């Protein structure tokens, strides 16, 4: 994925030194856009190894509407452990907002079910979107959502999606985010009897943490390999009935892992 490496190079060359919530410090740019044609391969970076189970299980966890790390830990996934309280709770983060957004009149909105209904019944709608940025509950979340809004677009029986990410950890987080939403597009396309189209990614504060810069410089020396292919082995009756075993990624031959420290 040359686009990803080009972004790293851009930040290293033009990034602004900024302070951040974690105290680590970043090199940051404001505003960046990338587009991935999902027909040309599954957009999982090859210039370092990514932990595929973490990507898939996290997405399934979001879709379950869960906000406790119990499911993740049962599947040996620890990517949210640093933000959980002693009971494993994270507050009303992504899963809660996707599946059970609280309204002022006491009702709950399942944004994912609404999206599925709209794609099937009104595919030309300009309102097929999901928001995680619930202003009234941000302070209750252990971590404010980074990828905050995604919108679907149907054209000629192909499903595309654009994501807006307000804050992006390019070295550790972005490869996961791109792959996760690509999987989601494949899942929803399958459920709605559509083909996959494009994934468009737009970032706000797009940054490298300063303790990742030298690691990123090592990564950009690697030449990207052919993208793998995502295969969904069966079609469940519902978007919410997929399991980890339903996904197979073929032809993924990445370079070795480059491990970076996460900033909490």
From Swiss-Prot:
Q: What is its EC number?
A: 2.1.1.45
Q: In which pathway does it act?
A: Pyrimidine metabolism; dTTP biosynthesis
A GO molecular function annotation here is: thymidylate synthase activity
Q: What keywords tag this UniProt record? A: Cytoplasm, Methyltransferase, Nucleotide biosynthesis, Transferase
Reply yes or no: does the keyword Ligase apply.
no
Compartments annotated for it: namely: Cytoplasm
Which InterPro entries does this entry report, sorted A to Z? Thymidate_synth/dCMP_Mease (IPR045097), Thymidate_synth/dCMP_Mease_dom (IPR023451), Thymidate_synth/dCMP_Mease_sf (IPR036926), Thymidylate_synthase (IPR000398), Thymidylate_synthase_AS (IPR020940)
Question: Which residues take part in binding dUMP?
Answer: 21, 126-127, 166-169, 177, 207-209
Q: What reaction(s) does this enzyme catalyze?
A: dUMP + (6R)-5,10-methylene-5,6,7,8-tetrahydrofolate = 7,8-dihydrofolate + dTMP
Q: Which CDD domains match?
A: TS_Pyrimidine_HMase
Functionally, this protein is described as follows: Catalyzes the reductive methylation of 2'-deoxyuridine-5'-monophosphate (dUMP) to 2'-deoxythymidine-5'-monophosphate (dTMP) while utilizing 5,10-methylenetetrahydrofolate (mTHF) as the methyl donor and reductant in the reaction, yielding dihydrofolate (DHF) as a by-product. This enzymatic reaction provides an intracellular de novo source of dTMP, an essential precursor for DNA biosynthesis.
State the name under which the record lists this protein.
Thymidylate synthase
What's the source species for this entry? Buchnera aphidicola subsp. Schizaphis graminum (strain Sg)
């Amino acid at each position: 994925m040359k686009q990803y490496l080009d972004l790293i190079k851009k930040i290293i060359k033009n990034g602004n030194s900024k302070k951040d919530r974690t105290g680590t410090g970043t090199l940051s740019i404001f505003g960046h856009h990338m587009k991935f044609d999902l027909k040309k391969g599954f957009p999982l970076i090859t210039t370092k190894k990514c932990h595929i189970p973490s990507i898939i299980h996290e997405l399934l966890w979001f879709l379950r509407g869960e906000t406790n790390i119990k499911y993740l830990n049962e599947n040996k996934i620890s990517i949210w452990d640093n933000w959980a309280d002693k009971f494993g709770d994270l507050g009303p983060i992504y899963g809660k907002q996707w599946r059970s957004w609280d309204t002022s009149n006491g009702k709950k909105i399942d944004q994912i079910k609404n999206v599925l209904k709209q794609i099937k019944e009104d595919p030309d709608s300009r309102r097929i979107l999901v928001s995680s940025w619930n202003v009234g509950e941000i302070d209750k979340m252990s971590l404010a959502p980074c990828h905050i809004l995604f919108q679907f677009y149907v054209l000629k029986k192909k499903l595309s999606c654009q994501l807006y990410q307000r804050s992006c950890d390019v070295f550790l987080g972005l490869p996961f985010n791109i792959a996760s939403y690509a999987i989601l597009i494949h899942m929803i396309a399958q459920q709605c009897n559509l083909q996959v189209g494009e994934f468009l990614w737009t970032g706000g504060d797009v940054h490298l943490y300063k303790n990742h810069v030298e690691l990123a410089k090592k990564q950009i020396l690697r030449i990207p390999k052919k993208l793998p292919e995502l295969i969904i082995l069966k079609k469940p009756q519902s978007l919410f009935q997929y399991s980890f075993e339903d996904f197979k990624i073929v032809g993924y031959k990445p370079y070795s892992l480059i491990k970076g420290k996460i900033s909490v």
